[in-house]
Amino acid sequence: MFKEYTQYDALGLADLVSKGEVSAKELLDSAVARANKLNPKLNAIIHRFDERAYDQAQAGLPSGAFTGVPYLLKDLSYSFEGEPLTMGSRSVNIQSDYDSEIVKRMKATGVNTFGKTNTPEFGLII
């Protein structure tokens, strides 16, 4: 695990990966450990797909500005192939069969998505 994980922003983490000072797997280990520690109190992450992210780290991520950086996607209207989409609503439970354009673009940057975060229902704030 990479103990200095919280001392860097996404560009700093990507720079460390590109220099070979830390691996995408080590960053993911750190992100998963923090999520496991903090999420029970926060309920911020509602869908986890750690195994998929570990497979991606092992197989190799696209080369981009954020290669190897762990990422959490907001569960609004962003389809991530093979993962659920609820938009924060109990009335919506879509199993995504494609990546939305924003997800395609994020993947192209090399981020390693390992979950989806909570949102108010349909993203509405009253």
What are these regions (language model features)?
Residues 48-65:
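Histidine-rich, glycine-flanked metal-binding segment
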